[in-house]
């Protein structure tokens, strides 16, 4: 598919180097051709998710920062979204992200989980001020993405990305991707497209329900909260469908 080929293989364009930070973002290869049945079901049990955690790979402060940043981006989409769901933290997704981050493998995975979960990756070397610095490049893809006009979705919507990649941003603002779980791991050594990075900070963020379906727009354009799923019972918070749930995470220990 032209869409996939335009996203995968643009690795050389995704390197950003600053005075104190070197960063790479993985081209999002979780884009798929067709939505399978029962996409609302994402059975993480047995798919590389550890039953017991020895230590957490993300702090409460970083968790809140990532969640708040995602919801800020989701609430401020243009055109406005009629069905954007408020994003909450999900403990199972965080555990699955931990399991992958600790492998220190620079690719999307594990493969069996990718059928159910969306995933964005980032890796950095050097210092950074905030965990948000690790994901800001995802949201900055917005400047390359054009939301498809309803008249162009007949019925499949075109993919309108003028830059090297837009799929990190579209996963962030996918309306039904209302659950997020991330993990950060410092890899002593990791192979990044043939180069060895040492003491690299590896961020994995998993999303459910999985987004980035080819032929679909990230959300329905319209008056905020005017097309929320029935389960939200008409509740709205900051231009997003809101259930009152902030997080399903376990007590922080």
Swiss-Prot record:
It is found in: Secreted. GO terms for molecular function: peptidase inhibitor activity. One of its GO terms (cellular component) is extracellular region. Residues 1-23 form the signal peptide. Keywords: Glycoprotein, Protease inhibitor, Secreted, Signal. Glycans are attached at residues 28, 120. It comes from the Eukaryota. Residues 67-207 form the SCP domain. InterPro entries: CAP_dom, CAP_sf, CRISP-related, R3HDML_CAP. The keyword ATP-binding does not apply. Belongs to the CRISP family. This is Peptidase inhibitor R3HDML. The gene is R3hdml.
